[in-house]
Amino acid sequence: VEPLAAALEIPSQVHLSPEKNVAIIGDGRLALMIAQVVSLYGVDLTIIGKHEDKLKKFEKLGKTRHIDGETYEVVIDATGSPGGMEMAQNIVRKRGTIVLKSTYAGNLNLNMSYFVVNEITIVGSRCGPFEPALNLLNRGLVELPEIELWDLRDYEKAFASHSFKSGFKFPV
């Protein structure tokens, strides 16, 4: 439920409406939760990811192809890697907003004057409300990604599983 609650923090921080052009960078579990929440607002949504198999899960929520040169009013970085912020900087419109859902180890090397000159707002976004997340689940408005459950004694099988190799988190 936590990734869904984190996704629900975004609409409390950024105004979303049908006329907004929004991009989500990332194709993992958190990005999937964010895409489901953001799509409830009727935005023009594009999901940008590197894994064709993962992007198939997003097709009913928005476009899964970024067109070179296209820019967005709101860009949400859910990659977990510094390259996500670099891409966000390249595709956000002037006077647009970048929402950072990623936490990076170490520092990013950014030219901050670019954000000032182009009047780009950067919003840090972390945890969110659990009760509304549970409400969305109970009403069937969002679906949680499939997870694999493992007994602790089967930890070797868990680490050898497809979910671990594909970068999805799972409880042991």
Which positions does each model-derived feature cover?
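C-terminal hydrophobic helical "lid"/dimerization subdomain
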Residues: E86, E131-V172
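Short active-site oxyanion
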Residues: V43-L45, E119-I122, L144
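A general structural signal for well-ordered alpha-helical segments in protein cores
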Residues: L4-A7, A31, Y72, M85, ...
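Structural detector of well-ordered beta-strand residues that form the stable sheet scaffold
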Residues: T46, T97-L100, V123, G167
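N-terminal Rossmann-fold cofactor-binding loop
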Residues: I47-H51, A78, R126-C127
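Rossmann-like dinucleotide-binding domain for NAD(H)/NADP(H)
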Residues: I122-V123, L136
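Glycine-rich cofactor phosphate-binding loops and adjacent beta1-alpha1 units
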Residues: V14, K56-I120
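Mid-domain Rossmann-like dinucleotide-binding core that forms the NAD(H)/NADP(H) cofactor-binding site
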Residues: V1-G69
